[in-house]
Amino acid sequence: MMARPWNFSAGPSALPEAVLQQAAAEMLDWHGSGMSVMEMSHRGKHFVQICDEAEADLRELLGLPADYAVMFMQGGGLGENAIVPMNLMGRRSTPAADFVVTGHWSTRSHKEAGRYGDAQIAASAAEATEIDGQAQSSWTWLPPVDTWRVRKDSAYLHLCSNETIGGVEFTEWPDPASLGAPDVPLVVDVSSHFLSRPLDIARAGLVFAGAQKNAGPAGVTVVIARRDLLGHALPICPSAFDYANVAADHSRYNTPPTFAIYVMGLVFKWIKAHGGVRGMEEANRAKAELLYGYLDGSAFYRNPVQASVRSRMNVPFVLRDESLNDAFLQGAEAAGLMQLKGHKSVGGMRASIYNAMPLAGVQALIDYLKEFERRHG
């Protein structure tokens, strides 16, 4: 068996090796049941135990109060861009929602919501600007909260708190009351930094995350919603996507992605065993500081994001000489550094350094960056 490479994929991303080993060991026989998790009925006692334990562990990791429902759904973050408005826009007589647009994913959220109601932009980073005397191109900065314009009668205010492609991150979420909209719940797409640092879930009405970045394999989406927001689905909302139904049946209203939920539950236990969300935050801060520190000190590479809003999870960077891009990627793969190519919409490179990426992987990347610069700089 070949050595495992360092996987910098933005998602689906690397899983903790200990989780993969446990899943492999239990593949044919889960806890003496004689069955693989993939063969279990989603309503049978074994899977009910797996699902309920995963929810309990997640609640413990996040300190969730009882008035928040936890749902394990399907469709990914992109699916939630439709499921959220179908569930929440019915809270108002005229379906409407506001959006803080800061990159690719919040742009798609805004566009999708427009199919179900009046989706307006409350703030945007779509234009170039200047911050502290530094020119910033579009999607590399975040609009100051005091510039947001939120309607008091909106069904919700949406933001993406970590833009996977652009590499910008909200470290704090505003209280809608401070924006003059106390009755407008905050909806946050936390997909690419879920469980990477403490998040003030209680400040939001609803958060969602595709698991395939920090929480597990592709196929399951975590939705956490304040219970008073359930039960307002638009008539066009499919029953399987109605949060009230999913919450009432403990994520088993229809057949859920059983194996993905099982592996996600193993990831929750791995996080608990490694210091919980605080432990993840400490490790992620160290990795990000190491990588950004090297990039900032190099004249060969450049990170385009405003320093104060850089993501700890997704680090885009460009080579000053873009004609070397192909050689860079080929050399990286030869060195066991995989999935470093940037998203097609922005080009360049991107290193996603999620929870499962150890400090040693980031150091291996930096060693390669140094060597490539030495040979081509």
UniProtKB/Swiss-Prot annotation:
Q: What does this protein do?
A: Catalyzes the reversible conversion of 3-phosphohydroxypyruvate to phosphoserine and of 3-hydroxy-2-oxo-4-phosphonooxybutanoate to phosphohydroxythreonine.
Task: Tell me where in this chain the PTM N6-(pyridoxal phosphate)lysine is found.
Answer: 213
Q: Record's superkingdom?
A: Bacteria
State its cofactor. pyridoxal 5'-phosphate
The cofactor remark states:
Binds 1 pyridoxal phosphate per subunit.
**GO cellular component terms, semicolon-separated:** cytoplasm
Catalysed reaction(s) here are: O-phospho-L-serine + 2-oxoglutarate = 3-phosphooxypyruvate + L-glutamate; 4-(phosphooxy)-L-threonine + 2-oxoglutarate = (R)-3-hydroxy-2-oxo-4-phosphooxybutanoate + L-glutamate
| Main location class | cytoplasm
Query: What is its EC class?
Result: transferase
Q: Which InterPro entries match?
A: Aminotrans_V_dom (IPR000192), Pser_aminoTfrase (IPR022278), PyrdxlP-dep_Trfase (IPR015424), PyrdxlP-dep_Trfase_major (IPR015421), PyrdxlP-dep_Trfase_small (IPR015422)
Q: What HAMAP family is this protein classified in?
A: SerC_aminotrans_5
- The EC designation for this entry is 2.6.1.52
Cross-referenced Pfam families? Aminotran_5 (PF00266)
Q: What is an annotated GO biological process for this record, any one?
A: pyridoxine biosynthetic process
Q: Which protein are we looking at?
A: Phosphoserine aminotransferase
Query: Where, by residue number, does L-glutamate bind?
Result: 43
- Entry keyword set: Amino-acid biosynthesis, Aminotransferase, Cytoplasm, Pyridoxal phosphate, Pyridoxine biosynthesis, Serine biosynthesis, Transferase
Subunit-structure text? Homodimer.
Subcellular localization is given as: Cytoplasm
Binding residues annotated for pyridoxal 5'-phosphate, in chain numbering: 105, 164, 189, 212, 254-255
The UniProt similarity line reads: Belongs to the class-V pyridoxal-phosphate-dependent aminotransferase family. SerC subfamily.
The molecular function GO annotations come to: O-phospho-L-serine:2-oxoglutarate aminotransferase activity; pyridoxal phosphate binding
| Pathway assigned to this chain's UniProt record | Amino-acid biosynthesis; L-serine biosynthesis; L-serine from 3-phospho-D-glycerate: step 2/3; Cofactor biosynthesis; pyridoxine 5'-phosphate biosynthesis; pyridoxine 5'-phosphate from D-erythrose 4-phosphate: step 3/5
